[in-house]
């Protein structure tokens, strides 16, 4: 029988509920338990696939093709498990299911209400995750902040879960802000007290409070939180401002796994954190700083490229260097200033992104110039998704001399080097129209991609609708572009490279989704190694 941990947040958003949940997942997995993680998001979008990166940050794609919240990237990196579409449930999806059932007459003409129909649908998703994953522990993060009107059905649903499953099978963990007031040199517990009081008014008594704070908290503060939150002092955990990847180690040092095992009546846990300790050692050994220029469209919100930046840092630690990212807005790069913006670059990365007709000036030409600068100056280059398409178009224009080479996604052109995938008809719809999830990529022998992966093929995660136009492949290949990774079944290009350069490679899929702290993605690892050699 599965046991459940629900993680809520209070006072303000952005406190690190996802990192907290992930860290707990690490501890429990290191204790020999099977863990499954999911997140409930209160917004009414069916999924985040059509949301602006400025609103939502990165869209993380699971192997089964679900477009999900960026927190799932944290979950997968921390617990080293591939999650599924059942790991991210939105209010939009819940209400859509309820309305569809009502239209089919499944409620026998009854009045459809938030309680019990919406809450039952939410609980169904929790229990379905338990039955399909066969996990020992289901960790569920509730998005938003306690008290938000949008999250009330989820709070009510998880209250009912404890009633149905029993106190020894359910834990409520609450992450709350404990601000430090510099003027008085005090840590204030009042916001947390009020947040827990709000939670109590909704029928939930938290079992563990995670105090999110800038400064370490002394015993007096911990005792005060415990007193006013009705919990033992040992059940107050502290999360200070450290690198997110270190949170699990900090939780381990506070015996979070012991607290959880007592609350859930688990057998005595033997937690082996040796793998994470090795990773922490790598971080501590990484002193040299290497700068990589990332030329992207949404750099004002770095969370839009969260998995990319995390993958770079992980690869850096693997090679005992710290990666510093120089964020360059693609829209700012033009022929007058590209030399200035990109000079002294040791490595250039152009990540994914989307654009639309009439807005091709919003960054795409800047990405093309970045690709050209890297190629002409023999700078290690790595392109991802839209970044690969930019690299192919740049090569077509400046090496093959196809001056009007472009993407049909952006503009009408006689030479659509990038065109819509056959079978993906053009449509005004946005949601659910992409090539999503894992597809088998075959690597061409004696290429850089084949060397880096060390295998003939593998499944890679895609999120796109446009591809290299096969009508131009022969011309591009004759000019020196190598198509080193292919989806053979439909003859689609997945990886390109230029062999005469130390590292000039781009992938149509998203390698950043598969990096793990002790297992950097091979393409990121190879790119960072090339940058180190170029320093």
Curated annotation (Swiss-Prot):
Pfam families: CTP_synth_N (PF06418), GATase (PF00117). It catalyses: UTP + L-glutamine + ATP + H2O = CTP + L-glutamate + ADP + phosphate + 2 H(+); L-glutamine + H2O = L-glutamate + NH4(+); UTP + NH4(+) + ATP = CTP + ADP + phosphate + 2 H(+). Keywords: ATP-binding, Glutamine amidotransferase, Ligase, Magnesium, Metal-binding, Nucleotide-binding, Pyrimidine biosynthesis. Its EC number is 6.3.4.2. InterPro entries: Class_I_gatase-like, CTP_synthase, CTP_synthase_N, GATASE, GATase1_CTP_Synthase, P-loop_NTPase. Pathway: Pyrimidine metabolism; CTP biosynthesis via de novo pathway; CTP from UDP: step 2/2. The keyword Ligase applies. CTP binds at residues 13, 148-150, 188-193, 224. One of its GO terms (biological process) is 'de novo' CTP biosynthetic process. GO terms for molecular function: ATP binding; CTP synthase activity; glutaminase activity; identical protein binding; metal ion binding. Residues 1-266 are annotated as: Amidoligase domain. UTP binds at residues 13, 188-193, 224. Mg(2+) binds at residues 71, 141. GO terms for cellular component: cytosol. It comes from the Bacteria. ATP binds at residues 14-19, 71. Residues 291-535 form the Glutamine amidotransferase type-1 domain. Allosterically activated by GTP, when glutamine is the substrate; GTP has no effect on the reaction when ammonia is the substrate. The allosteric effector GTP functions by stabilizing the protein conformation that binds the tetrahedral intermediate(s) formed during glutamine hydrolysis. Inhibited by the product CTP, via allosteric rather than competitive inhibition. Disulfide bonds: none annotated. The active site is at 385 (nucleophile), 510, 512. CDD domains: CTPS_N, GATase1_CTP_Synthase. Catalyzes the ATP-dependent amination of UTP to CTP with either L-glutamine or ammonia as the source of nitrogen. Regulates intracellular CTP levels through interactions with the four ribonucleotide triphosphates. Homotetramer. Belongs to the CTP synthase family. PANTHER family: CTP SYNTHASE, CTP SYNTHASE-RELATED. This is CTP synthase. It comes from Spiroplasma citri. The lineage of its organism: Bacteria, Bacillati, Mycoplasmatota, Mollicutes, Entomoplasmatales. The gene is pyrG.
């Amino acid at each position: 029988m599965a046991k459940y941990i629900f993680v809520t947040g209070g006072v303000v958003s952005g406190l690190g509920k996802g990192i907290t949940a992930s860290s707990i997942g690490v501890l429990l997995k290191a204790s020999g338990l099977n863990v499954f993680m999911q997140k409930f998001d209160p917004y009414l979008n069916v999924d985040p696939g059509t949301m602006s990166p400025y609103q939502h940050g990165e869209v993380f794609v699971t192997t089964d093709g679900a477009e999900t919240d960026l927190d799932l990237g944290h979950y997968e990196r921390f617990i080293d498990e591939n999650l599924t579409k059942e790991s991210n449930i939105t209010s939009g999806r819940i209400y859509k299911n309820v309305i569809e059932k009502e239209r089919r007459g499944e409620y026998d003409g009854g009045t459809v209400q938030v309680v019990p129909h919406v809450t039952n649908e939410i609980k169904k998703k929790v229990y379905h995750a338990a039955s399909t994953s066969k996990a020992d522990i289901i960790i569920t993060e509730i998005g938003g902040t306690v008290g938000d009107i949008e999250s009330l059905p989820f709070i009510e649903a998880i209250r009912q879960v404890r009633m149905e499953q029993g106190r020894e099978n359910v834990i409520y963990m609450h992450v709350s802000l404990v601000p430090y007031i510099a003027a008085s040199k005090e840590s204030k517990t009042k916001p947390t007290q009020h947040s827990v009081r709000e939670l109590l008014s909704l029928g939930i008594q938290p079992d563990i409070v995670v105090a999110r704070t800038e400064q370490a908290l002394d015993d007096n503060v911990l005792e005060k939180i415990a007193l006013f939150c009705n919990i033992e002092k040992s059940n107050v955990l502290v999360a200070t401002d450290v690198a997110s990847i270190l949170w699990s180690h900090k939780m381990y040092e506070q015996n979070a796994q012991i607290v959880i095992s007592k609350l859930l009546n688990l057998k005595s846990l033997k937690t082996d954190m040796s793998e994470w300790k090795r990773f922490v050692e790598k971080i501590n050994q990484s002193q040299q700083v290497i700068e990589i220029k990332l030329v992207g469209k949404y750099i004002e919100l770095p969370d839009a490229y969260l998995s990319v930046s995390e993958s770079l840092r992980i690869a850096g630690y693997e090679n005992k260097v710290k990666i510093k990212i120089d964020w360059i807005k693609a829209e700012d790069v033009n022929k007058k200033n590209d030399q200035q913006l990109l000079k002294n670059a040791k490595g250039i990365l152009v990540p994914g992104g989307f654009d639309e007709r009439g807005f091709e000036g919003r960054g795409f030409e800047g990405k093309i110039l970045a690709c050209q600068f890297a190629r002409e100056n023999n700078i290690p280059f790595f392109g991802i998704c839209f970044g690969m398409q930019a690299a192919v178009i740049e090569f077509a224009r400046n090496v093959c001399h196809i001056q009007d080479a472009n993407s049909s996604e952006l503009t009408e052109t006689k030479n659509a080097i990038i065109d819509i995938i056959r079978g993906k008809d053009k449509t005004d719809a946005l949601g659910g129209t992409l090539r999503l999830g894992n597809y088998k990529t075959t690597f061409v022998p004696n290429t850089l991609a084949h060397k880096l992966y060390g295998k003939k093929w593998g499944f890679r995660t895609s999120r796109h609708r446009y591809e290299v136009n096969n009508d131009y492949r022969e011309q591009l290949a004759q000019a020196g572009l190598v198509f080193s990774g292919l989806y053979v079944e439909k003859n689609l290009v997945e990886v390109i490279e230029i062999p005469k350069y130390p590292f000039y490679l781009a992938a149509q899929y998203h390698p950043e989704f598969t990096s793990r702290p002790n297992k950097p993605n091979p393409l990121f690892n190879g790119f960072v190694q090339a940058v180190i050699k170029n320093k």
